[in-house]
Amino acid sequence: MRNFIKNHTGIVCILVFVFVFILCSFLFRAVIDKMIDEDRYHSYTRYEIYTEMNQLTYDSLKSVLVEQVNSYIQQSAPTSALDGLVVVNNCMDYDIDICFVLAQGEIESHFGTKGLARKTNSVFNVYAYDGKELHEINKNGKYKHPDDSVEPYIELLKREYLVENKTEYDMLKKYVNYCGKRYASAPDYEQKLSSKIEKIQQTTDIENTYQMLKKQGYILGID
């Protein structure tokens, strides 16, 4: 054996080198794979933490906003049964300015506590809508609960008023639908609505909280 090694020293060195090289390659690959796996793990963990923190922020902001809306409704109309959560959810779902909605709900029926709304529960004095034709569900415009009247009102805005890139604040100049029909007959309706919105923005943090909630929703991919 010793003679073989002496006679074939070059070959033995090459074989040893190849063996060591292969061994080191495997070890190096194992270390690299472990580092990659750990990096993926930590990156995934950081992403999860980031998402969870954003979700907690979103939920907290939403709770604050609902409380602010309920507080405003109760201060303006203590006997109102309108739930702020319903208002917030619909404004977020349809991307409607929440101060505009609150202002109109207060002007139209004092949040369901005055006028015909006491019998119809139609906070915005809008008839029911089934997605196809106005007045199809309920020709009398009656709802079981004031909360049920919020979405039909917002759908009406989206379908007939907020068209051709018009915004809620365009309605403060001339509140008409695509046919030119006014939402209300009062000639100073736009001024009343504008003043009410300004009051809400100046006396509450509803607008600021709503905008923060929308931004947080964009971060989380919530439409």
Regions found by a protein language model. Give the residues of each.
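Catalytic cores of secreted/periplasmic lytic hydrolases that degrade extracellular macromolecules
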Residues: R2-L102, E106-D223
